[in-house]
């Protein structure tokens, strides 16, 4: 019905090409098993989820899960413990699901059932504008910050010996920039 496109465009400068084509017909209803679901999410991963100036969680994921709940006729309780804790909450049965801009990996598929992807993103390396770092080779001997538990952390760990950098993990994205 175009809701996903509208949400993505509101929060990003991305075109519709960032929104994957799905095989599920829009508006197709399922019968909820429960009247209320506990959904865990990240606490700081803008534009997907972050706190606004009123300390309310907002962003793509927050709008999307609320739209899904409304469309499918169930209530949600959203918790924002952070990415690692959200994953742990679902694994421990403390939450029914997670919405957190999570990359789909083979390891995660072994543990979780995923919806169809709603956004296509790439792993990128960000540096200060004045930096001379232009490639992974330039990271030799440097320390690279990454959010714990992410696909980016997996990528960096898998390539650490190849490029010779150190890895420093952070519990949330905003801490990397402080």
Protein language model features and the residues they cover:
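Ligand-binding "clamshell"
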Residues: 18, 94, 106-121, 161-164
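A ligand-binding cleft/hinge motif common to bilobed small-molecule-binding domains
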Residues: 84-88, 100-111, 155-160
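Periplasmic-binding protein-like
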Residues: 1-11, 152-156
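Flexible hinge/capping segments at coil-to-helix
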Residues: 127-144
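Extracytoplasmic small-molecule ligand-binding "clamshell" domains
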Residues: 1, 11, 26, 30-102
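Ligand-binding cleft/hinge of the Venus flytrap
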Residues: 49-52, 65-74, 152-173
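Short beta-strand->loop
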Residues: 57, 142-148
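Hydrophobic residues within well-ordered alpha-helices
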Residues: 68, 90-91, 139, 176-178
């Amino acid at each position: 019905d175009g809701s996903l496109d509208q949400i993505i465009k509101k929060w990003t400068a991305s075109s519709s090409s960032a929104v994957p084509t799905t095989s599920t017909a829009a508006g197709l209803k399922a019968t909820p098993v429960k009247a209320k679901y506990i959904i865990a999410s990240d606490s700081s991963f803008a534009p997907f989820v972050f706190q606004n100036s009123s300390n309310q969680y907002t962003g793509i994921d927050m709008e999307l899960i609320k739209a899904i709940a409304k469309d499918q006729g169930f209530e949600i309780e959203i918790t924002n413990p952070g990415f690692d804790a959200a994953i742990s909450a679902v694994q421990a049965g403390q939450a029914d699901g997670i919405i957190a801009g999570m990359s789909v990996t083979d390891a995660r598929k072994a543990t979780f059932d995923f919806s169809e992807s709603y956004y296509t993103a790439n792993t990128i390396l960000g540096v200060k504008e004045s930096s001379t770092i232009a490639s992974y080779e330039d990271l030799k001997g440097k320390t690279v910050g990454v959010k714990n538990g992410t696909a980016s952390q997996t990528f960096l760990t898998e390539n650490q010996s190849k490029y010779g950098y150190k890895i420093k993990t952070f519990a949330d994205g905003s801490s990397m920039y402080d």
